[in-house]
Structure formats: structure tokens, C-alpha cells
Regions:
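Cytoplasmic membrane-interface regions of multi-pass membrane proteins
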Residues: 1-3, 7-9, 70-74, 149-164
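Hydrophobic membrane-insertion alpha-helices, especially the h-region
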Residues: 178-192
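Membrane-water interface of alpha-helical transmembrane segments
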Residues: 52-55, 124-134, 172-179
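Interfacial transmembrane-helix boundary/kink motif in multi-pass membrane proteins
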Residues: 8-16, 163-174
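Terminal transmembrane helical anchor/hairpin motif
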Residues: 43, 81-166, 189-211, 219
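Alpha-helical transmembrane segments and their helix-start/interface "positive-inside/aromatic belt" motifs
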Residues: 75-88, 173-182
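Helix-loop-helix units of permease transmembrane domains in multi-pass membrane transporters
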Residues: 1-25
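Secretory targeting signals
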Residues: 17-78, 116-119, 129
Length: 222
């Protein structure tokens, strides 16, 4: 018995990094493909720092966060088809929320602000909101990973009652402490973001911004 817990913990701890390695390899291959195409077209001013920042920080973190969410779905269901269904619901849910104008990144799970890059200013000030929301949702992903560890079982046991009993057995002082710290950090970061986006500044949806831009264009057109 004393050897089974370390093996179980090792198996769980190795799964999330292995899953996250898949999008990382894909992005690395995309960067290499970009460089190869540029070289074939006789362009040799390679901006490797920009490529890797755009791929792994701007795009990569989005993929990693969604990977963790899908990983938790597989843990809770232990069924690949139900896990695929959860992924489909997540994608459709984001589309529905956009259509209903619920677009705030504080509650659109793992949806990060867009970043704009220009040759003159680089990413400029657009990267700051991205960094804060990335921190916010990364903390939430850490909470999901802890929950995943609590409900993780090996073998064919799929009953939620068994998973709940296993989770209660693992919910010791270390797990509770880590959960509490991450929840406090998550709430604190969310409050700071809300203060900056909704109190210090005026928050508006995409449609509201488009309408304001159209009105400004009509005004100055005269």
C-alpha cells in the first residue's frame, strides 16, 4: 500500500505536462515552418524572439489553458466521448455568449483579450490586459489541476460516488491550503482586473465599440 500512492501521484503528475507538450510541439513546428518558408523566399531577417513570443506566449497559453480544461473533463467523466461532448459544449458556449453580448473576459472561461502587433510599437499597451487575464485564468487552471488530482482514479472505476470518496480522502491540509491560496489569488486578481476595466475605465462590448466608431466616423466625415 505504501508504494501505490507514489505511483498514482507520479502517473497523475506526468499526464498534464504530457498533454501540454502536444500543442507546444505543434507550435514549435509552426515556427520552424514559418522560418523555412521565409528562407525559401530569400527572406533572412528572422525575428526569432517575436516568433516564439507570438507562438508560445500569445497563442500557446490559450491552447494550454483549454487543454487543462479538457483534461479535467476527461477526469470527471472518464469517458472519451463525454469528454469530446464537453469540449463541443465549451466551443458552442463561447459562441452563444458572444452572440448574447456576454463578452467580458472575467467570465468567458479561458478566453483572453486579443493582442495587436505593429512594426512601430510592437505589442504596445495591448499586451498588459492580455498578461493580467492570462495570470487570472492560469490561477484558475491551477485550481482545476488540484481538483483533477483529488478526483483522479486509475482503472475502470467511473462512478462519481467512488471519485467523491477518493477526493475526500485526499483532501488533507496540504490540498486545502493550496486550494485556499489559489482561490484567494484568483479572487484578488479578478477584483483588480474588474476595478481597472469597469471602474477606472468604461467597459463596452464589441457591438458598442463598433457603434461608437461608426458614430465617430460619421461625425468627422462632415
Amino acid at each position: 500500500f505504501k508504494f501505490s500512492c507514489p505511483r498514482r501521484m507520479t502517473a497523475w503528475a506526468g499526464t498534464p505536462p504530457a498533454l501540454c507538450l502536444v500543442p507546444c510541439i505543434t507550435l514549435f513546428a509552426a515556427v520552424l515552418t514559418t522560418i523555412s518558408v521565409q528562407a525559401v523566399k530569400h527572406y533572412h531577417h528572422f525575428e526569432l524572439g517575436l516568433y516564439f513570443r507570438g507562438a508560445f506566449l500569445i497563442l500557446g497559453i490559450r491552447l494550454l489553458l483549454v487543454t487543462i480544461l479538457m483534461f479535467l473533463g476527461q477526469i470527471l467523466t472518464n469517458n472519451r466521448y463525454v469528454g469530446f461532448l464537453i469540449a463541443l459544449f465549451y466551443i458552442v458556449g463561447q459562441v452563444v455568449m458572444d452572440a448574447l453580448h456576454y463578452q467580458h473576459h472575467l467570465y468567458q472561461v479561458f478566453v483572453l483579450p486579443d493582442t495587436t502587433y505593429s512594426d512601430m510599437n510592437g505589442y504596445g499597451h495591448f499586451v498588459k490586459p492580455f498578461e493580467w487575464f492570462s495570470l487570472y485564468w492560469t490561477i484558475f487552471a491551477a485550481i482545476l489541476l488540484i481538483a483533477g488530482h483529488l478526483f483522479w482514479v486509475r482503472g475502470t472505476e467511473t462512478a462519481m460516488s467512488i471519485r467523491t470518496r477518493v477526493a475526500r480522502g485526499r483532501l488533507g491540509i496540504p490540498a486545502v491550503t493550496m486550494l485556499a491560496l489559489f482561490v484567494i489569488a484568483f479572487v484578488t486578481t479578478g477584483c483588480y482586473i474588474f476595478y481597472n476595466t469597469n471602474v477606472l475605465n468604461h467597459y463596452s462590448t464589441d457591438d458598442q465599440r463598433d457603434k461608437r466608431s461608426a458614430e465617430t466616423w460619421k461625425l468627422y466625415k462632415k
